[in-house]
Amino acid sequence: TVLVLGTVMLFSCKTNMKDVDAIGNRNGMPEMSGENMELFYSDSALLKYKVITPLYNKYNQDDKKYDEFPKGIHAELYEKDGSMVGSITSKYAKKLEDEMLWELRNEVVVINAEGKKLETDLMFWDMKKEIVYSDRYSRLTSGDQIIEGNKGFKSDQSLKNPVFNKITGVVEIENKP
């Protein structure tokens, strides 16, 4: 009777592996998500930048680790002394963790400490190399000049030495009192 009872129990408790896999499979789902967040990024206990976002998703998959900001960001960048040196806004952003590379899309605006304003629809920020670049139309407003590059630009991240591709013109802006 013990053998019969054990056999009945063995066959009555059957696990469907497809059901188990479906429960454990979270591919495509964020590991962490949050709304109306402020994220602080530091290095050696010094604040490097702060990101404010309405929606944050963190993905930690085997081959890809990235943070996604599907509703955009406002980021503030800081010097070692704590002074703010610039800001970045965009309607969409994604940060690849291992590469330390930001992809910013849709109405990207960068303003540096000197007040230079860069506008483009797509920009990459390589934090390892400390450069920003784009292959799309870009516009830099600096004081009384506007520089437009039809094929993008490349610059240090502080926008002190931008190089534009296929410049369409430098326009002097007249400031009237």
What are these regions (language model features)?
Residues 1-177:
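Mature-chain termini and adjacent capping regions
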